[in-house]
């Protein structure tokens, strides 16, 4: 028997109903803020991710699912490991920034070759939200406020903690990177193996090392906050002021750097204590250089150039402001199951059972009910015996079963059985057409 690939999971109907419920709440909040839905390809050119994410990141070096197509010459392609790069590519390709400040959201699968564990899979799903065109700190605060409202709507507000940091501008990070490398080079032998490698490829990622020994070394390391310019400091302080005015609590985490190279200024994470090591549920920040950077992609070796850029922090391209976040849906559902479980959502409200001799009348009744009550989920079984159909009705989770036999046809009535109490009554054929008589369960 062929089975699903390791790290790629089926989402079966009972669980899928909870996914749809979650996605509807998230979409509702996004609609309240005026964000528009965009659908993006799951496959992009490999160069896009190498340039956007950074050639020295774990994602590009070790985690991407890449292949070449059958064109001549072959084109290197990659299953998307994240959504921001594709969203920026779409904004550039379709000139969405021309005279506008698009606010977009998307939802769907992402792919990374990682060791599968609870809350971390090789195919996983993200909600991505991107706001383009504003360099002002209110755009940062708006996204954070939006996520705060999402937690409130999902009953998770008390389970989430907001962490903030500022990465400053490119030249400020470059100066800090040099100071950090100088400090750590003398202590290189005390670093864990990953941090030793990152010292020459992506030293800022050492700040979020999970190794206690490395964190101990960082206590006396130079602080990024001391390298920020006046404008970066003012921007970050204004974000904090907005959040305070909105009543959103936060904590400053000076080691928060994020795992993608495109971020600048504000970065943030929503974390929880309920999911063990997979504590981050939502994360994002500002990426003012990425739109302009991807506009300037040429035919050079993108991965090699991205590594060179990460090392030398080359001359910045024109700033095209943007800010966004991504939310892991698997982790979010794990958190919901732990603290505010979504009740089982039945796939059926009304089950129609019809005697085989009048089965066509049952089909007609069910179809008319679907027209008159589009809010109801109406099911029927095949034209087997009444007993067999009733067994299926019992298993369906329906609140009511409508029974139609010759007697009901003659009397122009229906028999209605309450599946919870077992009580049965006779009613007019149009009884269920009146919402006052029966409302569907949420």
UniProtKB/Swiss-Prot annotation:
Its main location: cytoplasm. GO terms for biological process: histidyl-tRNA aminoacylation. It is an enzyme of class 6 (ligase). The keyword Cytoplasm applies. GO terms for molecular function: ATP binding; histidine-tRNA ligase activity. Pfam families: HGTP_anticodon, tRNA-synt_His. It is found in: Cytoplasm. Keywords: Aminoacyl-tRNA synthetase, ATP-binding, Cytoplasm, Ligase, Nucleotide-binding, Protein biosynthesis. InterPro entries: aa-tRNA-synth_II, aa-tRNA-synth_II/BPL/LPL, Anticodon-bd, Anticodon-bd_dom_sf, His-tRNA-ligase, HisRS-like_core, HisRS/HisZ. It catalyses: tRNA(His) + L-histidine + ATP = L-histidyl-tRNA(His) + AMP + diphosphate + H(+). It comes from the Bacteria. Its EC number is 6.1.1.21. One of its GO terms (cellular component) is cytoplasm. The keyword Cytoplasm applies. SUPFAM superfamilies: Class II aaRS ABD-related, Class II aaRS and biotin synthetases. Belongs to the class-II aminoacyl-tRNA synthetase family. Homodimer. This is Histidine--tRNA ligase. It comes from Psychrobacter arcticus (strain DSM 17307 / VKM B-2377 / 273-4). The gene is hisS.
